[in-house]
Every structure is written in structure tokens, then in C-alpha cells.
Amino acid sequence: MQLNELNCVILCGGKSSRMGQDKSKLILKNQNLTQFQVEKFSKIFKNVYVSAKEDKFENHFSLIKDSLEFEVYSPMLALYSILSNFKNEFVFVLSVDSPKVGENELLKMLPFLEQNYKIIIAKTPLHKHPLCGFYHSSLAQTCKNFLEKNEQKIGLLFSEIKTKFVEFEDEDAFLNLNFYEEYEKFKSELR
């Protein structure tokens, strides 16, 4: 299996409460963070989609909207909505605010898709990264079951589904832009 045979979905529906503004629209090199991620991953994957509650990008991207079945704002709803759009395949899911994840990290996770796992996510010494990994589309129903019980955390899947945590040493590769200072620092590194 090759990365260019797979689909990628960039999650852009978070509340961005710590950032104080919509992270998906932060500007990097004359484009917003969503464009930055879509452009980068379009060179790697078959298709790149954007997941959000509504189309805040004016049809600029292939959009997967959150399901209206549940009136919540959560990563589990986004994952359910994403996986419901695919059949019998793995999908790479990444939050928009992880701009340093790239092909090297993906290639380290890729071999595990051929093994007997349904979830393959990145793990560093300090954190598991549930919004950086491959999820099999067959998990949509499991996500729905959690939502029906008002369980919103993606981490709940790991105890029920065969999951591979792929170990990475470099915390920096999985940087999340949660605060404005982190965004400013990352922006200055791009110059």
C-alpha cells in the first residue's frame, strides 16, 4: 500500500479557544493554515479533504461536514462524519494545527496498515496523538455508538479497537499550534 492510494482529511472544526481565533485561518506565507496543510498533503495523498462543521472556506476545498445526527462539538463527531464518507479503507486524519507532520512521519506509520490494526496513531514520549493517524472506515459505527452514549473522546476507541501506537522520539514534529506564541514562533521558523 502506498500513500498516494490513500485519502487524507484535515480537521478544521476545533473551537480554537486557547488560540483566541480560528486556527484554520491563521496566515502562513500568504495562505491560511488550511491551505498550507492541503497543499502539502496533496503532493502525498490521492485526495485531501477538509472536515468542519460548516463550509467556512467558500467551496475552496473538498469538504466533509460534521453529521447533523448529533448536536455536539467534538473530535468523535468529526471522526464519525469522516469515516462515514469512506468504505473499506484507511483514512489519514490530522488536525489542521499540526503543521510539522510530514511524509517522514507518515512513512513510519504506513507499514502497520498491512497488519491487523484498525487504528495507527503517532505517539511521542510525552503524548499520544489521536488526531495524527490512520483510521479504518469500518470504525464509523463504533464512533456512532460512543456518540449515542455522549462519549466524545477519541481515546476511548483505543481500549476497544486494535490500535498501534507508532513511537516517535521528536516531540517537535507533532507540535500543536494551541497558543498565539506557538503560531508566531512557527511562522518565524518558516522564513
Curated annotation (Swiss-Prot):
Reaction equation(s) it catalyzes: Mo-molybdopterin + GTP + H(+) = Mo-molybdopterin guanine dinucleotide + diphosphate
Q: Which InterPro entries does the entry mention?
A: MobA-like_NTP_Trfase, Molybde_CF_guanTrfase, Nucleotide-diphossugar_trans
Record CDD domains? MobA (cd02503)
Gene3D superfamilies, alphabetically? Spore Coat Polysaccharide Biosynthesis Protein SpsA, Chain A (3.90.550.10)
The source's superkingdom equals: Bacteria
Gene Ontology MF, one: metal ion binding
For this protein, the Enzyme Commission number is 2.7.7.77
Query: Which keywords does this Swiss-Prot/TrEMBL entry list?
Result: Cytoplasm, GTP-binding, Magnesium, Metal-binding, Molybdenum cofactor biosynthesis, Nucleotide-binding, Transferase
The residues that hold Mg(2+) are 97
Q: Show the Pfam families listed in the entry.
A: NTP_transf_3 (PF12804)
Q: Which cofactor does it need?
A: Mg(2+)
Q: Where in the cell is it found?
A: Cytoplasm
The record, for SUPFAM superfamilies, names:
Nucleotide-diphospho-sugar transferases
UniProt: GTP binding residues: 11-13, 23, 66, 97
Q: Which GO terms are recorded in the biological process aspect for this UniProt protein?
A: bis(molybdopterin guanine dinucleotide)molybdenum biosynthetic process
A Gene Ontology term for the protein's cellular component:
cytoplasm
Give the record's subunit note.
Monomer.
Q: What does this protein do?
A: Transfers a GMP moiety from GTP to Mo-molybdopterin (Mo-MPT) cofactor (Moco or molybdenum cofactor) to form Mo-molybdopterin guanine dinucleotide (Mo-MGD) cofactor.
What does UniProt say about this protein's domains?
The N-terminal domain determines nucleotide recognition and specific binding, while the C-terminal domain determines the specific binding to the target protein.
**Per the similarity annotation, which family is this?**
Belongs to the MobA family.
Q: What is this protein called?
A: Molybdenum cofactor guanylyltransferase
Q: What is the gene name?
A: mobA
